[in-house]
């Protein structure tokens, strides 16, 4: 009986501690993987227009803009072009920015999207985060009808937690010969 009382007391203490921590946050509402370092949700939403212009200033920016344009064209069927000085979506790469090499700042307003990064890697990760803000159908290789192409207005700042990326291969579950 004494052990049961101790067990019940422990369970109640755990339940009380769980209630002390908030279960939702701004980052949880956005659903980006990996979770960004800093996320501020703003009011409103960015509606992807029928004619999208993705602007850039560097060669890395051009490659990222082309990749993004190809994905958006395929899934939305919209007229997506790259180039120009001002676009609905702007990719700005500047080595003078004070952020980590692979860091970025993504600003989504009702008027447009701005991705700022120090390097092309950071801009690419910013573009990937923006794509995750759109409906999941954006990953479709064919045009998807009946989807409202909108993204929540927000301001996201992110950078990798570590300066390296890793890969783990479990040899127990992947049968590789000794040779």
Predicted features, each with a name:
Residues 9-20:
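Bacterial N-terminal signal peptides
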């Amino acid at each position: 009986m004494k052990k049961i009382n101790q067990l019940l007391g422990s369970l109640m203490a755990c339940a009380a501690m769980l209630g002390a921590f908030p279960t939702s946050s701004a980052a949880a509402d956005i659903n980006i993987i990996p979770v960004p370092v800093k996320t501020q949700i703003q009011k409103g939403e960015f509606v992807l227009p029928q004619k999208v212009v993705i602007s850039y200033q560097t060669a890395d920016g051009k490659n990222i803009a082309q990749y993004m344009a190809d994905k958006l064209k395929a899934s939305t069927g919209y007229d997506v072009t790259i180039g120009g000085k001002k676009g609905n979506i702007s990719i700005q790469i500047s080595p003078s920015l004070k952020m980590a090499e692979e860091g970025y700042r993504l600003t989504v307003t009702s008027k447009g999207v701005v991705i700022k990064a120090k390097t092309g890697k950071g801009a690419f990760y910013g573009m990937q985060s923006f794509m995750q803000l759109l409906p999941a159908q954006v990953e479709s290789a064919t045009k998807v009808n009946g989807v409202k192409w909108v993204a929540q207005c927000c301001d996201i700042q992110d950078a990798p937690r570590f300066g390296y990326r890793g890969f783990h291969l479990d040899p127990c579950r992947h049968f590789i010969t000794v040779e």
